[in-house]
Structure formats: structure tokens, C-alpha cells
């Protein structure tokens, strides 16, 4: 059975503008798990923004304050594997009963349940039992609940009945703070200019930040050299996929408009002319795929459209690609 990571706590979860709300709500839940406020908590954000650390911190803090509580962290994938094994062993009822005894259930990466209808149905019943009995449910996903296209509507409704908290990629200043915390914790000596350089080139991924520091430590020991800009540049090239010019929705609109020989203003207009519908849909599809921006925000930037229009456009393009 998976366990909480005791090293991922609130003490080493560095706060910034991108995670302030989520961290505050998570800490409140850990300190007051017996209230039904903010239940369930649905956290979403791109890979590497700190979701797993945050949900672990909630669980660890809860166990420290309430040792008698049964707190379980599990990935959605492992939950699904366990469920399939239970079905094969004709032990589905035992599987469900076990999860119904949990006081705080933390499920990570729930987006992996897309199209897994039986898993969704089983979790729906577990969710209802826990919720009715005042138990805590915390869910993490790489996208908003409204963009879990192949999730059942009734489960989506359950996900949204508590609090929805977005975790954005950390900005440069938060990356610097995270790096400095790790540097102090590991007893390293790294010049401020190197720290700033890493923060600016690691694409806002906490995993990348930690990976770069670990690599710097290894290189420094193996080659018996100080950690300086030269070494940092060498490590960055190997450890991080550097994106010098992040793609924006404006970039995509410009490229798509040029390809289809129409103007950006026309693509972003309210016009429903056929020669504008396709470039508009392609723009939305590429924006969702390459900017990791929520559908609602993409819609606002492409003619002030709602998230359902963006999702429909992406589906249309995906269907064409399959032909």
C-alpha cells in the first residue's frame, strides 16, 4: 500500500503567488480535518508545479496533528490497477470497503481515469460514502475538472462541489526561493548569479530545479570543481529542455493566420465564415497542446470564447488528425 512521503511537508513547501491560495487552504484542511469546509479539494496545474508535494504535505500534517486518522495517498493509476486486480479476484466489495474506512483519501493524477468507466463508477460510490460520512477527499489533476473530457458528468460534479485550486508554474522569484531553500538544506555554496540563471532557464518546473541542483552537486564532486556559471551552463544543457522563447497564444494565432492566409483579427472575430472556423479551431488546439493554458483562458484570448467552445474545437481537430 502506498505511503505518504514524509519529506514533502509544509515546512519545505516554499510559498509564492502561484501557490499561496492552495497552500493556505491545504494547511487549513490539515489543521481542521473534521470540518466539511473545502471538501473535496481539487488541485490542478501543469506537471512540475508542486501538486504532489502539496497533497503529501496535507496528509503528513494531518497525521502529525491527528495520529489516529487513517490517511491514504495513492496515484490514480495505482488505484485503477488495484481495482482491476480486485475484479479479477472477485474481491470488488472488499476493495470498496477498504477505501470506505479511510479518513482522508488523497488521489493524485485523476486525469488518468479518462475512459476508465468502471474505475470511475467505483470511485464515485467510494466518494459518496466518504463525503456523506464527513471524511476528507483531496484530488490532484494536470488540468481543470471542466477539461476532463472523458470523465463522467456526475463525477465531475462531485469534484467541483468543494474548492477548486489552481497551481501555476512558479515564477522566477519563487524558483530562486525554492533553489535557495534546497541549497541551504544541502549545505551547498552556489553563487547568486548561478541561482538566478538556473531559475530563469528551468521553465518553472520544481522537478527541473531539483534535478539541476543534484546534477551540479554530482559534477562538482566528480570533477572536484566549484559550482560556477560555466558548470551551471554545462549542466543545464543536459538536465533541462531549455525554452528560450516560450510559445504564446499570440504567436500561435500569427503562425496559423499566415498559414491559412487570413488576418489575426479575422480569426479572433465573431465571424462564423467557413474559411475562419478551421484556423480558429487549429489555433485553439495548438494553444491547448503547447501552452498548457486552461481552456477558459485560451477562449478569452481567441475572440473571448468560453471553455466549451475551446474543448469542442480541440475535439474537432483531433478527429481530423485521426482520419
PLM feature segments, named:
Residues 34-56:
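Walker A/P-loop nucleotide-binding motif
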Residues 63, 68-104, 117:
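Short glycine-rich substrate-engagement loop in P-loop NTPases that contacts/grips substrate
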Residues 2, 29-38:
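Phosphate-binding P-loop
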Residues 266-323:
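Terminal-proximal interaction/regulatory segments of ATP-powered molecular machines
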Amino acid at each position: 500500500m502506498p505511503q505518504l512521503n514524509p519529506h514533502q511537508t509544509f515546512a519545505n513547501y516554499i510559498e509564492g503567488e502561484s501557490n499561496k491560495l492552495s497552500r493556505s487552504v491545504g494547511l487549513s484542511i490539515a489543521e481542521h480535518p473534521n470540518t466539511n469546509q473545502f471538501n473535496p479539494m481539487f488541485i490542478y496545474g501543469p506537471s512540475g508545479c508542486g501538486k504532489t508535494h502539496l497533497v503529501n504535505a496535507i496528509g503528513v500534517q494531518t497525521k502529525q496533528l491527528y495520529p489516529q486518522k487513517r490517511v491514504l495517498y495513492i496515484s490514480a493509476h495505482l488505484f485503477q490497477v488495484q481495482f482491476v486486480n480486485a475484479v479479477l479476484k472477485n474481491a470488488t466489495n472488499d476493495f470498496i470497503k477498504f477505501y470506505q474506512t479511510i479518513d482522508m483519501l488523497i488521489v493524485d493524477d485523476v486525469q488518468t481515469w479518462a475512459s476508465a468507466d468502471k474505475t470511475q463508477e467505483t470511485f464515485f460510490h467510494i466518494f459518496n460514502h466518504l463525503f456523506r460520512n464527513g471524511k476528507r477527499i483531496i484530488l490532484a489533476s494536470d488540468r481543470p475538472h471542466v477539461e476532463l473530457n472523458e470523465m463522467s458528468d456526475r463525477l465531475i460534479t462531485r469534484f467541483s462541489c468543494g474548492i477548486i485550486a489552481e497551481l501555476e508554474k512558479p515564477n522566477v522569484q519563487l524558483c530562486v526561493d525554492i533553489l535557495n531553500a534546497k541549497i541551504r538544506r544541502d549545505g551547498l555554496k552556489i553563487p547568486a548569479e548561478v541561482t538566478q540563471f538556473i531559475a530563469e532557464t528551468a521553465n518553472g518546473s520544481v522537478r527541473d530545479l531539483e534535478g539541476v541542483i543534484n546534477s551540479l552537486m554530482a559534477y562538482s564532486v566528480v570533477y572536484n570543481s566549484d559550482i560556477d556559471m560555466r558548470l551551471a551552463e554545462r549542466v543545464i544543457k543536459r538536465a533541462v529542455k531549455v525554452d528560450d522563447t516560450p510559445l504564446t497564444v499570440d504567436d500561435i494565432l500569427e503562425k496559423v493566420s499566415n498559414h491559412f492566409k487570413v488576418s489575426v483579427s479575422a480569426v479572433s472575430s465573431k465571424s462564423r465564415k467557413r474559411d475562419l472556423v478551421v484556423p480558429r479551431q487549429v489555433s485553439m488546439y495548438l494553444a491547448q497542446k503547447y501552452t498548457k493554458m486552461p481552456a477558459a483562458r485560451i477562449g478569452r484570448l481567441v475572440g473571448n470564447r468560453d471553455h466549451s467552445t475551446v474543448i469542442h474545437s480541440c475535439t474537432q481537430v483531433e478527429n481530423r488528425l485521426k482520419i
